[in-house]
């Protein structure tokens, strides 16, 4: 799989075929941040407070909206308003994993109304290509009101110990992504997938975005099998955007922590593209 990780965000924004990826890189460049904060809190008040306090220092906020005990229209309106105020994108870490007909309803209808507020979603390809096809059909339908403002990341790898998202599964993730370049932004993975073998030929201008989870400056793991890496190691391995949860929101001072991740993530990016 081709990789453009040695290019600057601004260069990739200018040439990228996917409009949401262009916006994502533009946000990163404007804010000098490649940080995605995983806001794994359980109330709307906590979520909106974090989004407001950390918003100036992040490119993306990642939610697990189904862990909120009080999800409502207030949650949607608040997130959308803060995304506008602080110029960040919203990534709902729903990890869709079902048959196509079901995920279409989960995405565009249902209690959580994900398509209304999440710029980015993700899925596992364990159900097969149909899950990506179904989500793409929904997002690209003529009556879908959000058009090019929505995109998908394929969960190609995970950072948990013993993960089965390896080998043939990861290769299949690349194969499927190449069939839906106008909707699939890239991958959640632990590295650039440039060396992964694929049966699908790359399209001209291919430039998949890599989000890497499990970034933490103060810990190497937890008791449940999570394995962490630093911003430097993640970006060095090909991450375009680093995802940190507890390293930021559970810090004694989340704002200062966000600033630290922003600085280290950005310095690692500059080193990668040779701008330092």
UniProtKB/Swiss-Prot annotation:
Keywords: Decarboxylase, Lyase, Pyrimidine biosynthesis
Highest taxon of the lineage: Eukaryota
Keyword Lyase applies: yes
Pfam families: OMPdecase
Pathway: Pyrimidine metabolism; UMP biosynthesis via de novo pathway; UMP from orotate: step 2/2
Active site: 95 (proton donor)
Enzyme Commission numbers on file: 4.1.1.23
Alphabetical list of InterPro entries matching this protein: Aldolase_TIM, OMPdecase, OMPdecase_AS, OMPdeCOase_dom, RibuloseP-bd_barrel
Record's keyword annotation contains Chloroplast: no
UniProt-recorded Gene Ontology molecular function terms: orotidine-5'-phosphate decarboxylase activity
Family: Belongs to the OMP decarboxylase family.
Protein name according to UniProt: Orotidine 5'-phosphate decarboxylase
Organism for this UniProt entry: Penicillium nalgiovense
């Amino acid at each position: 799989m081709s990789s453009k990780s040695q290019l600057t965000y601004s260069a990739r924004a200018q040439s990228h075929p996917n409009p949401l990826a262009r916006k994502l890189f533009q946000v990163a460049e404007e804010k000098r941040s490649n940080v995605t904060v995983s806001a794994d809190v359980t109330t709307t008040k906590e979520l909106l407070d974090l989004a407001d306090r950390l918003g100036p220092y992040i490119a993306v906020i990642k939610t697990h909206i189904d862990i909120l005990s009080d999800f409502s229209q207030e949650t949607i309106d608040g997130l959308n308003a803060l995304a506008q105020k602080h110029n960040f994108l919203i990534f709902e870490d729903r990890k869709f994993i079902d048959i196509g007909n079901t995920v279409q309803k989960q995405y565009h209808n249902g209690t959580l109304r994900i398509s209304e507020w999440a710029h980015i979603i993700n899925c596992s390809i364990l159900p097969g290509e149909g899950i990506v096809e179904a989500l793409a059909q929904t997002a690209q339908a003529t009556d879908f009101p959000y058009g090019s403002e929505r995109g998908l990341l394929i969960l190609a790898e995970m950072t948990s110990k013993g993960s089965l998202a390896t080998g043939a599964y990861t290769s299949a993730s690349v194969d499927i992504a190449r069939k839906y370049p106008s909707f699939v932004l890239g991958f959640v993975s632990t590295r650039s997938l440039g060396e992964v073998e694929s049966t699908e030929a790359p399209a001209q201008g291919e430039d998949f975005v890599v989000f890497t989870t499990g970034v933490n400056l103060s810990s190497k793991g937890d008791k449940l099998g999570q394995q962490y890496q630093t911003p430097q190691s993640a970006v060095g391995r090909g991450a375009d955007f680093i995802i940190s949860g507890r390293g930021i929101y559970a810090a004694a001072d989340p704002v200062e922590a966000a600033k630290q991740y922003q600085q280290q993530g950005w310095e690692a990016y500059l080193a990668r593209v040779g701008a330092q």
